[in-house]
From Swiss-Prot:
NCBIfam families noted in UniProt: PRK00281.1-4 (NF001390), undec_PP_bacA (TIGR00753)
GO biological process, one term: response to antibiotic
EC code(s) of this entry: 3.6.1.27
Keyword Transmembrane helix in annotation: yes
Residue stretches spanning the membrane: 1-21, 43-63, 81-101, 107-127, 145-165, 183-203, 219-239, 245-265
This protein's name: Undecaprenyl-diphosphatase
PANTHER family: UNDECAPRENYL-DIPHOSPHATASE
Subcellular compartments: Cell membrane
Biological classification of the source: Bacteria, Pseudomonadati, Thermodesulfobacteriota, Desulfovibrionia, Desulfovibrionales
Family: Belongs to the UppP family.
Length: 266
């Protein structure tokens, strides 16, 4: 039997590496946890709580941007109340849909559903890359984002409520299809993830607070620390690479993963 701390390290690393890549961290966590025989209510709460580590990695990396939302900077548009307004618009659609259909969404946390989401997301990614060839990528910096674009990305983010689809994939695709450069779509995807993930994680943790025990602290803290470190490195590397590569390699990886998992459970 694998120790709880070992499970925390493995799942923390998996979550941190996959959270901000367009491959679905939730899908990977469900699959890996299943093979580790880490299931049940404790596993479900852990999969939510460990996201806090990944969220904090984004906050640290983009600290100046978040501070700019509190202390407006001159000559920058994505700052102060306007920047908060853009993030609110992006958060609004998935926030409403997620709240209204929270119970139903929880029923989709199954291996077959994740396989379907991985496959569907891959197809969408390949199609979006093809469509973007004919779309002018005119939005280069965060300061060029408009409320219309921010809201549009929010509607795309609703796709990520299907476990296995990938929030990162949905928002990056949405940004690109709405005219943002690939690297900008990725950066905004990371920043916009913070309010959504804080809200979703906080809601789930409060709802399941009675499932926590003092004995769970080492597992959860270990997972969050590993997720933070893995996410920090992954974001740094991904931002350097995303302007040079397309979403296609990630789409093919998702298809391969879905096929392998299908064979394993067949």
């Amino acid at each position: 039997m694998m120790s709880w701390l070992t499970i925390g390290v493995i799942l923390g690393l998996v979550q941190g590496i996959t959270e901000f890549l367009p491959v679905s961290s939730t899908g990977h966590l469900i699959i890996v946890a299943k093979f580790l025989h880490f299931t049940g209510s404790k596993a479900s709460v852990f999969e939510v709580a460990v996201q806090l580590g990944s969220i904090m990695a984004v906050v640290v990396i983009y600290w100046n941007r978040f501070i700019g939302l509190i202390r407006p900077e001159k000559n920058k548009k994505f700052t102060g109340l306007y920047g908060i307004w853009l993030l609110f618009l992006t958060t609004l659609p998935p926030g409403i849909i997620g709240f209204l259909f929270h119970s139903y969404i929880k029923t989709l946390f199954t291996i077959p559903s994740v396989i379907a989401a991985l496959t569907t997301g891959s197809i969408f990614m390949l199609i979006s890359e093809q469509l973007c060839r004919n779309i002018s990528q005119r939005i280069v910096t965060l300061d060029e984002l408009t409320p219309k674009t921010a809201l549009g990305i929010g509607f795309f983010e609703c796709l990520a409520l299907w476990p296995g689809f990938s929030r990162s994939a949905a928002t990056i695709m949405g940004g690109m299809l709405l005219g943002a450069k690939r690297h900008l779509a990725a950066e905004y995807s990371f920043i916009a993830a913070v309010p959504v993930m804080f809200a979703a994680t906080g809601y789930d943790l409060l709802k399941n607070w009675d499932l926590f025990t003092a004995n769970d602290l080492p597992l959860f803290i270990t997972g969050m620390i590993c997720a933070f470190l893995a996410a920090w490195i992954t974001i740094k590397v991904f931002i350097l690479l995303i302007s040079k590569i397309s979403l296609r390699p990630f789409a093919y990886y998702r298809l391969l993963l879905a096929f392998i998992v299908y064979l394993c459970i067949k």
